[in-house]
Amino acid sequence: MMRRAQRSIATLVAILSLLVTAARTMPAAAQDPGGNVAGDKVSGGKNSGDNDLRDIHLGMSATDLPDAGYVNFACATDPQKTLTAWTGWRDCPADPSRFHAIQFGYDPATSREGTIVAGHPAILTLLVDDAGIVSGLRIETDPKARLYIRKKAFLFGSQVKSRYGLDGWSCTQAQPNAGEQPVGGVYVRERCTKTTDNRSIVVERNLFRKPDQDMKSFVDETRMTILRTKD
């Protein structure tokens, strides 16, 4: 049994190494079959146009947000505080930036695979300002996803960068500290920023293991934040 476990762990490490290599060498179009984060193929089959996610785009009024296709509305700062629809955004307290954060998901009746963005299970948060304008969007890979899906979470960052154009990103890569170790010889702690089309975009990718985590446990995630900028 010990040998079987060791083989399983070795296989997992090898897969992670291959995924990292693929992310570095694969053309952007191949990384993201839908062509963008909000495109037809990656967001439940809806026509996106210039939208940021499905039929949602920054700058639209919260009153124009469609309820159809979305469920599980709740205040991001207090998920126990549920909402019946987008119109309840005022019930969520504003943060220091004066944004009301609403967490939501895709309706399984129209999205059989659940809340999936570009092939990744995701946690979605919409930011509405005091004037009722959609001013931000956060997409985080779901840490509760099954291992065989979660191990690819760091690749979502590459897909986001492809969606908003590969040029013009400013990226920093941190070095491992005493509490972080590479996974299969690979360490990713990257933060990239870009401003384009009245949007400020931040993409954070992490892939590492903490000393107290076993061989099958590690941090593997992407967080994306898009904020509306002034014209």
Residue ranges and their predicted role:
Residues 31-91, 130-231:
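Non-cytosolic coordination micro-motifs
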Residues 2-13:
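Bacterial N-terminal signal peptides that target proteins for export
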Residues 1-2, 19, 36, 41:
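Coiled-coil-like amphipathic alpha-helices with heptad-repeat character
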Residues 11-22:
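Bacterial N-terminal signal peptides
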Residues 25-30:
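Boundary at the C-terminal end of the N-terminal hydrophobic targeting segment
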Residues 86-135:
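Mid-chain, structured segments of secreted extracytoplasmic proteins
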